[in-house]
Curated annotation (Swiss-Prot):
UniProt-recorded name of the protein: RNA-directed RNA polymerase L
EC number(s) per entry: 2.7.7.48, 3.6.1.-, 2.7.7.88, 2.1.1.375
Its biological purpose: RNA-directed RNA polymerase that catalyzes the transcription of viral mRNAs, their capping and polyadenylation. The template is composed of the viral RNA tightly encapsidated by the nucleoprotein (N). The viral polymerase binds to the genomic RNA at the 3' leader promoter, and transcribes subsequently all viral mRNAs with a decreasing efficiency. The first gene is the most transcribed, and the last the least transcribed. The viral phosphoprotein acts as a processivity factor. Capping is concomitant with initiation of mRNA transcription.
Database matches in InterPro entries: L_poly_C (IPR039736), Mononeg_mRNAcap (IPR026890), Mononeg_RNA_pol_cat (IPR014023)
Native source species: Rice yellow stunt virus
Amino acid sequence: MDDEGHGYWQDYDEDESWLDAENDVFDDDIFEEAEDNEHLVEGGDFHLKSALRGEADMLTNPIYEKEREKLQEDVGDLGVALGHLNVRPFLEKMGERISTDHTNTPLIENIKQGGFGAIHHMKSTARLIVAEAATVTETMLTSGVDTTLAGAYHFFEQNHPHMKCTVNMVLMFLTILNNVKNIRLNVDLHQILKNNISIKGSTVCMYITVATVAYFSTDIVVFDIDGQKYNTPKTYFLNACDKIQERFNVILYSYLAEGLSIPGSPPTYIVNRIIDWGDSILYQMGNDGYDVIALYEATVVGVILSRDDKDLSPTSGGGDFLENIQQDLGPVQQNHIRYLIALLHDMTPHQLADLHGLYRIWAHPIIDIDGGVKKLQKVTQSLKGDINSKPESQETVRSFRRLFVMDYFVKHQFYPPITLPEKSNCYIGNCIRTSKKIDESHINYNFSDWDLVELGGAFSIPYSWNVLHLAKDKAISPTRSEMYTMLCKTKRVFNAELRRGVLKLMNTTLTPLREFLTEVAEHGLDIDDCIIGLFPKERELKIMARFFALLSFKMRLYFTATEELLGSKLLRYFPQITMSSNLLDMQEKMSSMSRDLESQNKSVTYVINMDFVKWNQQMRESTCEGFLKNWSKLFGLPGLYSRSHQIFRDSILYIADGTRDLTPDPDTGIMVDNNVCWIDDGAGKEGIRQKAWTIMTVCDIAAVARHHPGVFHLVGGGDNQVLTVTYHTNQIDTDGNITEEGKSKIKAKVKKFIEALETHFAARGLPLKTSETWCSTSLFMYNKFMYYKGVPLRSPLKQVSRLFPYSNNTSMTLQSMAQCLGTGLRSAAQKEVSHIALLFMRNIWGSVLGWIILYCHPMLPSISSETCNSGVSTIVRGRKAINMKTHRIDLVALILKILYLPGQLGGPGLVNIYQMTMRGFPDPVTEAICFLRKFKNYLICVGSSYSSHLARMAGVSFSASRSYEPLIEDVCSLNLDTPRSGTGGKREVPRKILLKSRLGGNQHLKELLGIMKGPSEGEFYRAISSGKVLDVRVMHEITSSTLYAVTNTFTSRVDKTATLKRLTFKFSMLESLADAELKYIRYLSVRDDKTHDIMFDGCSRIIADECRTKGWGKPVLGVTVPTPFEYLQISWTDEHICDNNHITVRISNQDRQVTTETLGPCKPYLGAYTKEKFKMTEVAAAYGDEDVLSKSLRILKIINWRYQDGSTMSEIIKAPFRAVTDIDPQRMVQESTVTKGDYDHRRKMDARVHGGIPNFVTTPLSHISISTSTWYKHARGKNENIHFQACIIQTMYQIIIRTMSNIHSQEKLHVHECCQTSISEIQEPRANLDLTTPQMIPTFPTLMGNPLVYIPEQSITFDYSRTQEVDYSRRVGSLDCQRSTDYGWVDAYSSLSWLIMCDVIGWTKMPDSFYIMQQERVDHYLLSMYIISIWKVLKSEFDLHKTMLDWGPLLKVYSSDTGVQVLSQSMGIVVLGKLEGGLSVNMMDICNSLTGLTSNQIPPFSVNLALPRIHKQVATWWKLTCSDTMYCIQCSNILKGYWEGTLINTRIDNDLRCSECADGGISPRIVNAHISNLSDHLIKIIPDREEVQLPLLAGGEDLNNLEVVLSLEDEWPDSDDITILNRIGEMNDIDGRMKNYLEVMALLNPDVVIIRPEILELEILRRVCEVVRLASEGKLIIHILVEEPSYLESGAIYEMERAFPRHNLFHVQFSFRKPPEGLHKLWLLPQDITLARADVGDWLVIPFTQLLDFHDTITPDTRLHHQREAIRQDVFWSTKEQGGLGLVVLQHICTKTELSYRLDRSKVDVEINKMMIKDPVMGGKYVILKRRCSWAIFSTKYELLCSAERIKGNLSADGKKITSKDFSRTYKEDIIIFIISVLMRSLDCDEKRVMTLSYVECLPELLTLKPRFNKSGVISVRYLDYFWFFKRVYSYNNPEVAIPYSAVIKGVNLGSPRKEGYSLASSDGAP
């Protein structure tokens, strides 16, 4: 079967283009001269492709005039001329006439019914859709959708009874019109048509009724109605036919959507009124009415804008915008606009977005070519002055340099080639010289210094052309001399041989690309090539013609080549530009930018949508001069881009559509008259420099934005730029909203910014277009994608309108028409929520398509009913051919195959619901098998009469022969018995014609095409597929890198009929297509007449594998992927048997209005693409910039990834590279240790996408959370054929379909695996390479010396960045050094520590997830050794204190309990923050701490070539390993130069010491391993401790005490004063917390417990629940609360509920909503965000440190606050914990409660409770004191000594007598606390004297502390709280250590037993 999917020779993007763009500017449909031909010809004009011209313009064309004269001869007077606005109403009246005709002739009946009556009853069609929807979710069987659809269609028929007949009529007319030439040849016709068609002269006459006749010529249609004739040009007729079909689609779809109550769909009456609105305008105003129609889009946008907050709008919301667009309208026109505004007033944003797509429903105006020329000339010939010298231009050029240079540095870590003035000493220059990152906030940064930066040659120009880009079959302009010759001979401008680019290419020998561009840059284009044709744009709404440019061949080469250079090399440094972004990237970017619009509380985000007046034509040389010069310098060719406007000025411009008379001129080619031909036009041309001018526009915007505050984000391409600006404010009222004053200030800021934009662009000669430039706080719109307050708006109507088979642009075969419909359906599905209505539209048009095929096929002459019915078709069963005679083709059976037989199984290829659901599913065969198998079963369930058809259809049979070319082309294809289709046959025609072509001036191209001759290509396919097992993906990649792929791609590009005509004298393409089409239709009619070789019963994965093996005769690896629709089943109710192995789903809201029009709490899943985890070598990446080498280079990554180097397969993989260059491929092969990731999962082929994205509006996904983490059976790490993106998308889609059908589900769902055979292990070829290795070695074609496909190494140049990378690898010797392959913990810790420090400094950027994964793997103490050692070297080389360091990577690795303890206790770093919310450190503190630390032993290091900064790694190794080098000045200088990169000139495994020190005995240990491959070696217990001793970390002088003294002046301490150790100590006291929970549960006996979803807390609660006894009549509800989950966040947590006791006393809930009501609700460890959910009377258990964080958010009525109302008694209760930390139980606004203490507790805790009841403020202080002083409490001598060690370590024995005031506050307070504790603990303490303590005298040299007292006896108020605290603590404890008071007051000796006072060093304390 020849599938229509992407082949290996076709260009393939990562996904379908996200842009809904116009056709390529170089593509046009030129009217070619008709030729007499005895063969069949293809009309091709089934829909309007060109702009409409007036009758006078058309008569200037001699062909049209000649056809008109012939028609008059044949039929006489042509009658009334129907204008373009009258044709549609005329055809509608004619359709109504036929619909009401009762003559009942076969033709009339056929037109009346068409394909609409093929399915017997509309209820039958609806049942088909219900069964199809049931394949997604079985619950749709009882949804009642069939009744709804049938009812909606019935209403449509009632209100529009004649529309179906009109559609059928125009479809039949279009077929006849496009086959006029064939009917003239008396070809066979369908009997119904044959009886009603005759030929009169050269005119085809169709007799519809007695009084209705239609006359068709090639360019004019005439209708005779009751003796009155009406004529219209073909273009007018096509225009009307398009709109009739579009209106049918729009109105029918509106009825369906309204019937199904799809949220956001506009009411049908509004759709009809809007259509009538436009019709009435055109009826009243004629063609001029399009001036009003053209404002429809802007008006709809303006209505949406009018909903903005007027207080924030810089204008008046949408009001000013609506007024601006009406400025040029008269009163009558303005009234029309006002009426439209009134119509739209009550519509929601979703409805308005949908209606926005109707802007082409009123067809197109007749263009005014002369007016368009004058308007164009007015713009292009206006004088603008010297724009380049203006300050705004200088600012913009500086902005370009800034953006480019800084982004270049970010991507490469070095600057591009830059020249600076020798004597300049500016900050920017110094950063560039020293390769330091430019900090724009630096005090010395000066924006104007960018003027000093001269860019150099950063980019190289490739040697070779991309021949496939050149082969685009687009229109060009003849040269001047060719135009002169052509005008002299024919007086016309049409000549396909001169106007088709590919024909010109075949006749022109090209010099290499670099040579060509060098010639143009130095000398410009030859004057003969300076010519530009202007061709009117099609399908516009503007009356004044707009033109795109047709360039001469060489001019086109110049502009396309230079634009391609910008796109491939420069554009990547401007991420704001989205011209090359894929769909997923754009959706993510638009979603991110628009999400800021959701809330405008603390900040306001504005969307500024900019459009420019004649953007292309405003681009003058003076506007672009600064940029063009800079770009030229970047490519090393002055003049490369600067030549652009000189070429424009030198060019002669002419109107190229043939409607204007051109006079030949021997000097200029065409005589200049300044009307239709002119010169000296230096302005830009439409679409010629899009990328260049887009870059410049971005720089303009950036230049303005830098002067204004706010956060800016830009997205755009071309003249449509969308900017979001966010302003923050602190002017918030008590409700959390921005105050009026705050709004006013923000509005003033944005208004000032917009004014600055307008002023800047006006000065730059690029005025903004008022009618399309607007500012909004709600609407984000880019390229027809709309978001309102962050919500993507559904808008399918535009795509739905084009759902008809004749909108196809290729040959009108069954497959191409079906795929055209399928493409339109997928596009519409992307902008729709529910696909049910679209399925109905598909069935309608699929039925019509079946009717077209049998009754009025576009290839009518060869496919008629008689030939189909009397033919013979061949099917194959058991590899034996069977001839089947076709007696009669069953229309219903054909329609069912069109609708439901997927293309992968031999069908026409119309889409089903599975294919509409997502994009990117990798195996369409398995998907198709699953669909058909389930669909046939559900048809039986719904009682469909068509179930027997589908039962026979659900199977495949295989071809009797095997040719592996289709499999290699499409790796998923099957070898079916399907004949080659018409479209497939079309592929062979260009190939045959090119080989026989009479053209061939381009010898290099002729030589390339010559390899298609002979049997060599077939032999290659036989050889490459000769293995016993087919590793088809690798085979595909190999083949796509050969010259055969180049030639096949070239032939596929030659697809224009007119082009093919000129290639050979004999043209019989249509006969070949028609013959293939006839065979295919006959085949479809008999396909299922006999039982297939394989019928679809059972697992689709097994069936797919069987089909592949049986069809191809060999097993096929790596392509079979089961669809989740097969093996996943949602359990919609709680009554299911759960195997605890499932995907977990949570639904936050099921109201379909809410879910589709508002964002939910979850981040919507937009899909994902998998990425390859490793890169090519630097050398391979450098050579890959040459297009000729890129594909063959890319497949070299497969070596050592899929196949080992040295194997036969590796040599075959290298062969395509050897065929195109003389470079040794071995240099490009990556080492096996660097490869990472599975090939089947990670490899991105050019033939399919790896990943998947939803193909529907994603708003409902924000209300769904899904986790695959609970699918334990298929956990991460297993190599299985699961497509997880599809699992997520398809599961969510099932829920959406149910929601849209008003079928609700539980909030929590389980998705279980229902098929145990679908998922299987992926087979790896490494297990047995002999099976996949070809038995015959293929021969690869090569053309040495052909510059199109062969490049010698000496001809290749590199970009500067590539040169630096390759040169770096060469200079450090990393390419050929000796490496170790046995990795261990040394390599793991060396690499991880180096990578961390590289990220800290900013050399690299690893994802956060990588570091988070290392938290539990690493030994933090061991890692600290490496970090400290590397830091010593880094600090010695440059001043890191002045470098912006990001310690985030280090903190992420250490974000665990043990990690924080190592940071704090071992490394002395003060860590703040929380483990959950992120740690933070002071940069100076961490730098000082690391500097002060020393290690007793340097850990062993290794050098990893896979990590960055290899030379710095090597230098670090030498400095750490050989410390003696630091004492040799020569060695030190060598290493310093090596570090800086100035002396990198030797192998890294050589001895780098000087000649005297070097002995050659040592060298670094070198490895080359991906960091992920070393993770398993991050051991925590190091073996051989005798050999490898861990050094001890000693504290430096800057080591701080970690306790912080809390200020007691305020009621609450600042939460910032709480260190991370306090928090960890509090949270790590698991036993204390469990005891506390037990006490609380026993005390309160709660009926509801609310807890956060943390594993540890859930486990503690589970154990408590097992112990606690509940009242027999009670039931405990455990409510697990999750806030704002993403789709994968909560996986493992969901499963914790299984661990709770399983009996009727416990009920575990998991909900996003408010917890259930209860008498006693208990919140365990609530977070800040959940406190607001607590009700009056709820009880909270909060750790005290968290309470400090949250106390501001607790309501003022809570008794814990000082400011409180007079309410009844509250209770505050604390239990003692380890470390003196506490948990708090707080009853929140509770009623009076009498508490009895049921459990024993200490007397201290009782005291606290009493105090808290009496005075909560003092009680709170007491708890703070307990936390602060707990370290100084002691009962034993050992505890006293531990407390003393804390003080002892803080004393500096420097021999100087100091007092406590010389210490920091922390030290002073610690000493005071310690002394007070000892004093209050002493025997016979004199409390009155102790309380007069004044200060403590410290004698560091004696290690003695002496308390000093106030002689006056005044009590020390400062320390009163400490005295009070220790008095109460020690009053409840019996002393176990005797401390004499008399000794203590003399002093406390911490280490000297010989001094006076109390000595801790002696056993009894005596001195």
